[in-house]
From Swiss-Prot:
It is found in: Cytoplasm. This is Regucalcin. The gene is rgn. InterPro entries: 6-blade_b-propeller_TolB-like, Regucalcin, SGL, SMP-30. Its EC number is 3.1.1.17. It comes from Xenopus tropicalis (Western clawed frog).
Length: 299
């Protein structure tokens, strides 16, 4: 494990860096700053970040097959045209809950965009409980709700055989598994896969590797952990130099690099002095495992 290398590749400090997605065609990393209300794109070649400022918190962003991106922003699924920075609302959710916003999301292997909601944070990781839901945006822009009574809807991904959806509601301190019907996009039979240890922090964003193991970024835990879904056991921990690790994805030319986003919101001056690169983006190499290319939204 001594070959693992961790470097801060984007030192700009984002309030809540999240939703990293590798965009293969340009070799760039897409991500959001949730409360900074931005979608950003980092080019490893130029080491520059371009960003688009938005009018609401943006929980997640995904690639779109027809070009541009789709965001889970505020209480909307919205399209973003990167060239002219225009935003088009596709549909709204949770209209009876004005204090709710979207959080993490990801596209399933068939091109549907799943994203969940939560109430706006009172302070980091403190929310009005049970206000969120998990939704699917279908390619025809219709929306289906999977379930409600969620605290902080967070990381999700699918098993390599596409039969299982892995899902995190952060304040349950668990990673759950659900049966997933890839034909219809419906989920059922939710159960606990892994319960986090106290020192591991709060489960946040998540991705799967090419060996079918899950990687979970642990907020306030300063680490990503690797979980074997077959055994429900944690099999690896990689610690980072910042506590507020938020999400992770694989990227790079062969998907052998892991990118980890982080946050600085809610940190006092003394904490920031100790961890000045909180809110930056980290690259981990030498993990010895590759990731899976993200799917683009089909609609």
């Amino acid at each position: 494990m001594s070959s693992i290398k961790i470097e801060c590749v984007v030192s700009e400090t984002y309030k809540i860096g999240e939703s990293p997605v590798w965009e293969e065609k340009d070799g760039t990393l897409l991500f959001v700053d949730i409360t900074g209300q931005k979608v950003c794109r980092w080019d490893p070649g130029t080491k520059k970040v371009q960003s688009v400022s938005l009018e609401a918190p943006v929980g997640s962003v995904v690639l779109r097959k027809s070009g541009g991106y789709v965001m889970a922003m505020g209480n909307t699924f919205s399209a973003l045209n990167w060239q002219d920075q225009s935003v088009t609302t596709l549909t709204c959710v949770d209209e009876d809950k004005p204090n709710n916003r979207f959080n993490d999301g990801k596209v399933d292997p068939e091109g549907r965009f799943l994203a969940g909601t939560m109430s706006q944070e009172i302070r980091p990781a403190v929310v009005e409980r049970n206000q969120g839901s998990l939704f699917t945006l279908y390619p025809d822009h219709s929306v289906v709700k999977h379930f409600d009574m969620v605290d902080i809807s967070n990381g999700l991904d699918w098993s390599l055989d596409h039969k299982t959806l892995y899902y995190i509601d952060s304040l349950s301190f668990k990673v759950d598994a659900l049966d997933y019907d890839m034909k219809t996009g419906k989920s059922s039979n939710r159960r606990t896969l892994y319960k986090l240890q106290q020192d591991e922090g709060i489960p946040d964003g998540m991705c799967i590797d090419a060996e079918g193991k899950l990687w979970v970024a642990c907020y306030n835990g300063g680490r990503v952990i690797r979980i074997d879904p077959e055994t429900g056991k944690q099999i690896q921990t990689v610690k980072l130099p910042v506590d507020k690790t938020t999400s992770c994805c694989f990227g790079g030319p062969d998907y052998s690099e892991m990118y980890v986003t982080s946050a600085c919101e809610g940190m006092d001056e003394e904490w920031k002095k100790r961890q000045p690169q909180s809110g930056g983006i980290y690259k981990i190499t030498g993990l010895g495992v590759k990731g899976i290319a993200p799917t683009a939204f089909a609609g």
